[in-house]
Amino acid sequence: KQAVAFFNNYRVTDPLALNNAAWNFFLHVDNKKHLESAIKWGKQSVAIENAYYNNDTVASLLYKAEKHGEALKIANKALRIAEENGEDGTETEKLIQMIKKAQNGN
C-alpha cells in the first residue's frame, strides 16, 4: 500500500526504480487495482528508457491482469529489443507462449 502511494504521488524518474517496483508487484500482488498501478509504473519506465527489461515487465503485468492482447503486443516488442541488443529473450518467449495459451482458453 505504501509503495502504491509513493509511486503514484511522487514523480519518480529512474526507469530501474519504476521497473523494480512494477516487477515486485508482478511477483507478489494479485489485487487488480494495484496491478494497474504497477502497469502504469512499468509504462513510465519504458517512456524514460525503452529497453528489453522493462517491456518484459509490462508484458508480464498485462498478462497477469488478463489483458492478453496488449500483453502479447508488448512481449513481442520486448523480444525484438532483446534480439536487436543480443540479450537473452528466453523468458519472454515462454511468456508469449503462456499468453497465446490464455488467449485460446487453455
Q: What do the predicted segments below correspond to?
A:
Residues 1-65:
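Alpha-helical adaptor scaffolds
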Residues 32-36, 65-73, 86-89:
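Structural helix-adjacent loops and short alpha-helical linkers that scaffold large soluble proteins
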Residues 49-56, 71-75, 106:
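Short, charged low-complexity intrinsically disordered segments located at boundaries
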Residues 73-106:
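Terminal, low-structured helical/coil segments at or just beyond the last alpha-helical repeat
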